[in-house]
Amino acid sequence: MKETWRWFGESDPITLEHVRQTGASGVVTALHQIPDGTAWPAEEIAKRKAMIEAAGLEWSVCESIPMEQSIKRGDADAPKAIARWKDTLSRLGRAGVPVVCYNFMPVVDWTRTNLRWQARNTGLALRFEMADFVAYDVFILKRIRAAENYDPALVARAEERFAQMSEDEQSLLERNIIAGLPGGALVQTRQSIAALIASFDGIDSATMQGNLLAFLKEVVPVAEEVGVHLGIHPDDPPFSLFGLPRVVSTPADIRAILSAVESPNNGITLCTGSYGARSDNDLVAMAKEFASRVNFAHLRNVTVEADGSFFEDDHLDGGADMIGVIEALLREERSTAKAGRRTNIPMRPDHGHLLGDDITKKTNPGYSYIGRMKGLGELRGVIRTIERQLRREEAAA
């Protein structure tokens, strides 16, 4: 597997020099400075690529080309938005960026309710607290008929939680949910997010999935033409938020996506932390079933609680059998390498706890330096161990 590291460009407090010191050889980045709704200029792509290569690294994955809401709604503005997306994709491919990760989450991107939750090791982790999210949706945002989307017992707990919140706690919860996490959706206000949610009225899961599959039929031929492998990122968390449909959450969703356009360029980002936030997703089985179409891997672990709340655990702890997932991907790599079909799958340590003096530094939520480097070291140890075992198996065969 190719070790990579997410970097948010020149505004990232972590420098490319420090990225190189982690042992990663690839960079995962995007042109976050360019406004959504604008195709990325070829010269800006070339500038970013040159900057990365000057640091002795490679631009291995673009994460992500922004996905305009009109594409997800399939409205009258969608064709122009898809054309802009295709222009950016084409320019990335012609510049030599081999993988593009993207997502299809409506309105909000990856979402957490607490960005500084104390883990058992006293570091700080990201957490999604179900009662807090429902408290925001029902009692702070006051979305129409929001309570109908949740179990009555959960709404009752959320009401109790809301009654205990100070105004400052309510404001912090709102910022955590809608203020825009790194690489995700733009900063929203209470009014703007309510309007965006309302713009999806009447769009159910079947319609949303149809819009995604129509998008794929437009963009995959471009990806094939310029040699880019696409990897759709799962919904995070993989269940409905604000009553909105989410269509990249389960193995059945993946099968629909991959069968819509049968091409190695139409693949997935296997994010174990996102898929793992649903207890009914068997991550090892998914890694085995979809291995040939895994074009990018995010290796992260979560612990899911009885009510669906979850927190980001250490990379080798939590609910995911990380060793089993990595073994499945390494077996796929060796099989396809022998057949000459592709090179190593890029992977990155997805998120990390705030540890040591990172706790007091400016960091992008989830994207600490020490925590991710710790995770990368642990994952590297697993990879090296499994690779040696696979070599022994081959030698004995």
Swiss-Prot record:
| Gene Ontology biological-process entries | D-glucuronate catabolic process
Q: Which GO terms describe its molecular function?
A: ferrous iron binding; manganese ion binding; mannonate dehydratase activity
> Which EC class does it fall in?
lyase
Q: In which pathway does it act?
A: Carbohydrate metabolism; pentose and glucuronate interconversion
Which E.C. number(s) belong to this protein? Answer: 4.2.1.8
What Pfam families is this protein classified in?
UxuA
- What superkingdom does the record give? Bacteria
Q: Which UniProt keywords apply?
A: Iron, Lyase, Manganese
Q: Which cofactor does it need?
A: Fe(2+); Mn(2+)
Q: Give the catalysed reaction(s), semicolon-separated.
A: D-mannonate = 2-dehydro-3-deoxy-D-gluconate + H2O
Give the family per the record: Belongs to the mannonate dehydratase family.
Tell me the function of this protein: Catalyzes the dehydration of D-mannonate.
This chain belongs to which protein, by name?
A: Mannonate dehydratase 2
